[in-house]
């Protein structure tokens, strides 16, 4: 053990912590492209940037495929950036003059919104305008990541996972919390 040099981030003698921080690389797989390296999950989406929106528990990402919005794998075996299969998992964050956020699909140009079918309330991406049913607010989730909250009258409703095989995006009931999403910035 005498030949091992240890680089320390603290001093045993003074108890002082250095002014620098070293963070490990989150994804050390050299086969993954650089845009797969996420922005820290604590970073909220902002206008003008493009994101992959991922459920950190399942690893599934919000995807538009064949006109249907849902969750799909986002790993290298089933690459979510391959536009040849008709899928789009890149969402451009926009902001209107009243500061409401919207998420526009990079492939279709359609926004995430809701269908207003309150018996079976789902999210969809079928309109090319950023109107009230496509207005979102993002709030930090206590478990990390961020909740996507849609405007509903004078309040908010959260986005949850549900439906068939837990691959659909459903509107939460009044007062119910939502998923903690990670926003992974896509670098061009």
Predicted features along the sequence, with ranges:
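Lectin-like carbohydrate-binding module/patch detector with strong preference for beta-trefoil
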Residues: 2-188
């Amino acid at each position: 053990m005498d030949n091992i040099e240890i680089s320390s981030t603290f001093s045993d003698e003074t108890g002082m912590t250095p002014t620098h921080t070293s963070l490990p690389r989150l994804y050390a797989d050299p086969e993954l492209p650089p845009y797969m390296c996420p922005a820290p999950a604590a970073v909220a989406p902002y206008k003008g940037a493009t994101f992959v929106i991922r459920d950190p528990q399942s690893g599934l990402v919000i995807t538009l495929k064949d006109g249907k919005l849902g969750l799909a794998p986002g790993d290298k075996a089933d690459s979510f950036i391959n536009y040849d299969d008709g899928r789009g998992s890149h969402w451009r964050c926009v902001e209107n003059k009243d500061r409401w956020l919207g998420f526009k699909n990079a492939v279709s140009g359609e926004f995430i919104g809701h269908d207003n079918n309150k018996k079976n309330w789902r999210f969809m991406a079928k309109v090319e305008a950023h109107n009230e049913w496509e207005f979102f607010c993002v709030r930090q989730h206590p478990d990390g990541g961020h909740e996507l909250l849609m405007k509903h009258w004078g309040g908010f409703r959260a986005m949850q996972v549900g439906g068939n095989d837990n691959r659909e995006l459903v509107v939460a009931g009044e007062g119910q919390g939502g998923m903690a999403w990670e926003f992974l910035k896509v670098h061009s």
